[in-house]
Amino acid sequence: MDKLLIAADNALRTLFARPRAAQPSPARGLPEGDLSPAQRREAGALMRVNHVGEVCAQALYMGQAAVTRDPALRARLMEAAREETDHLAWTAERLQALGSRPSLLNPLWFAGAFAIGWTAAQVSDAASLGFVVETENQVARHLQGHLERMPPQDAASLAVIERMQADEQRHADDARAAGASDLPAPARVLMAAAARVMTATAHHI
């Protein structure tokens, strides 16, 4: 019960409170780019997708941490979630700077990711960590695509994405080192398909 109450409190904070970063944003000190209205809209849409990804990361780690009985793994998951809070704050700042907004479907994304994390952790800690590896690898590839699509004048957003990509890859490496099992191919395919639906929807809504 305590774990569920903590998860509910974290969900409310993630979805409705202003996130506070423990580390300064990589965008700090960088000038805002001279973007056309179309470029600004596209940069905002891309950053909204990234913000959704961080909402989902929070939910995924919380769902896993609520289930695992291994204190060391729980601490590892919560530390990763704290780093994702930095990402959440940084992407929220970029959304505001670009005159954009978070996805209106964030509660839905959060609920789905929490359920996935909870379910994966019910199987085994190794499967749970395998889910982290695959998720973070997919996010890192997705961020690489955003580095290529983001208007080059938006140095602030590019700096944030580059840092996030490095952090996500490190999370994947840490999870593998902690004993992650490889997910079966059908699970990876389903995850990629779900990610495509999420990113396409969040780009607009």
From Swiss-Prot:
The keyword Repeat does not apply. Fe cation 1 binds at E54, E84, H87, E168. Keywords: Cell membrane, Iron, Membrane, Metal-binding, Monooxygenase, Oxidoreductase, Ubiquinone biosynthesis. GO terms for biological process: ubiquinone biosynthetic process. Transmembrane segments: none annotated. SUPFAM superfamilies: Ferritin-like. Disulfide bonds: none annotated. One of its GO terms (molecular function) is metal ion binding. It is found in: Cell membrane. One of its GO terms (cellular component) is plasma membrane. It is a peripheral membrane protein. It holds the Pfam family COQ7. Pathway: Cofactor biosynthesis; ubiquinone biosynthesis. Catalyzes the hydroxylation of 2-nonaprenyl-3-methyl-6-methoxy-1,4-benzoquinol during ubiquinone biosynthesis. This is 3-demethoxyubiquinol 3-hydroxylase. It comes from Paracidovorax citrulli (strain AAC00-1) (Acidovorax citrulli).
